[in-house]
């Protein structure tokens, strides 16, 4: 399963960990993904999606109708 948010499209980013001695080591910054079951009223069924914390905030504000459009 890929680490990509269905709603926002967030993916892992790459960068450096920088120590106090200014040593740089490469690292991968993962998005904050969660698997959620969401009820789609139009289709009368549950849909399992991987969404980021930001996407969950968007869904709570706008509702799941926007998500249903993206999943089709």
UniProtKB/Swiss-Prot annotation:
UniProt-listed InterPro entries: Ribosomal_bL28, Ribosomal_bL28/bL31-like_sf, Ribosomal_bL28_bact-type, Ribosomal_bL28_sf
A Pfam family hit: Ribosomal_L28
GO cellular component: ribonucleoprotein complex; ribosome
Keywords: Ribonucleoprotein, Ribosomal protein
GO biological process, alphabetically ordered: translation
The organism's place on the tree of life at top rank: Bacteria
Molecular functions (GO terms): structural constituent of ribosome
Coiled coil (residue ranges): none
NCBIfam families, per the entry: L28
Protein family according to the UniProt entry: Belongs to the bacterial ribosomal protein bL28 family.
Protein name, entry field: Large ribosomal subunit protein bL28
Organism this protein belongs to: Chlorobaculum parvum (strain DSM 263 / NCIMB 8327) (Chlorobium vibrioforme subsp. thiosulfatophilum)
Organism ancestry: Bacteria, Pseudomonadati, Chlorobiota, Chlorobiia, Chlorobiales
Annotated gene: rpmB
């Amino acid at each position: 399963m890929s680490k990509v948010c269905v709603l926002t499209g967030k993916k892992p980013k790459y960068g450096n960990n920088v120590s106090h001695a200014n040593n740089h080591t490469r690292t991968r910054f993962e998005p904050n993904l969660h698997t959620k079951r969401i009820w789609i009223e139009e289709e009368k069924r549950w849909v399992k999606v991987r969404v980021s914390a930001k996407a969950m905030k968007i869904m709570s504000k706008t509702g799941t109708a926007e998500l249903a459009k993206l999943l089709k």
